[in-house]
Amino acid sequence: MHLLFVTSIVPDGALASGYEIANAAIIAALRRGGARVTVIGFTWPGKAAADPENTVVLGAIDVRTESASAPLKLAWVGKAMLSGLTFASVKLRAVSARDVKTAIQQAGPFDGYVLNSVQFAGAFEKLFEDRPSIFVAHNVEHLSARENAAAAGSLFQRLLFRREARLLEVVEQRLCRRARFVFTLAGEDRAALGVASDDRSAVLPLVTGAKAPAHKGPRRIDCDAALIGTWTWQPNRIGLDWFLGKVVPHLRPDFRVRIAGHMPSGITSTHPGVEFVDRVPDARAFVCGAAVIPLISTAGSGVQLKTIETFELGLPSVATSRSLRGIDHRPGNCVVTDDPANFARALEAAAANVRDVDGSAFHRRQVEALDVAIRLGLEKLGTVRHEVLA
């Protein structure tokens, strides 16, 4: 079976974000399931596709709102209003539908589409109606947009996110309805998308790499707690605001917290132990230098890749319940609480008595369950393909 994996940004091997880590895991699982996979989408500027022989590149594009100029942001808003598309999808209209159709045809004969998230599929929706499809819902995007609207700092942002939520809900409903099968990254997302039946959907348990992270002896602890993420992404920003505003005030003054990742303006902390370190050369080494990892998601849907990485590494953690979306097995060194004061106390206790565990068993269970779910989706798609050919 030859599948066309339709995604906004094609893998470049860097695995710089949770989205890219998830894509790599899903593509690898599809191939383990026996499918030939060709990927189509854009590259980041200055980046090349990791697997050029099996990738169709539509061009280079930077879709990050935080790094866009004010004129470009206004242009995106204007195009979204005129076209009726979401703000997220209109960014991908850097090429015409005709160009995308030509690229699809040049990909060669194939049996179906894997529509990876709503952004690209929503930008060129009608082009993907001629063959059976699987829809991969990384998040319930319309619910995330509603949460973003509630947390928006300005009326303009609030109205923009509300519009995004309305449009996304309709597009997600259409993509799910047309898809022969739907993959989500968290169990609760199946019901939220109206595909809770086992005949319509399955959860994809993810991993951050093909192999479990290797242990290299005792860790060197540089700080009490460490966080790293794309804080300009609104659901992550909401969690960071909660952590800094609600949890950190309960921490001892000498408790050391290091926070890495691109930081939006306005993020500060008066706690003497909090340090913002911007980007770091090695994200894994950074988190392994902490006694405990705070998993602080309070918004959004889908799965938290930082949670998966923490569990694969066997690191101690304190997690909100939202941080465990899509996770069936919680290791013994993970404490769960949504109360800020209890969260702070649990961090201090974990840092005072560091207890790592072997994360390889967690990784192995995730891979096995991922492959089972992928095979189920491929079987559903294969059944439709045979019906069409008949």
Residue spans for each PLM region:
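Acidic donor-binding loop of glycosyltransferase active sites
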Residues: 285-302, 313-315
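Short hydrophobic beta-strand element within catalytic cores of glycosyltransferases
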Residues: 306-310, 316-320
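N-terminal subdomain of nucleotide-sugar transferases
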Residues: 1-60
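Conserved catalytic-core segment of nucleotide-activated headgroup transferases in glycan assembly
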Residues: 203-272, 276, 280-289
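Acceptor-binding helix/loop patch of EC 2.4 sugar-transfer enzymes
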Residues: 71-90, 134-166
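Membrane-proximal helix-turn-helix segments that form the acceptor-binding/catalytic region
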Residues: 101-105, 141, 153-182
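A conserved catalytic-core segment of Leloir-type glycosyltransferases
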Residues: 42-102
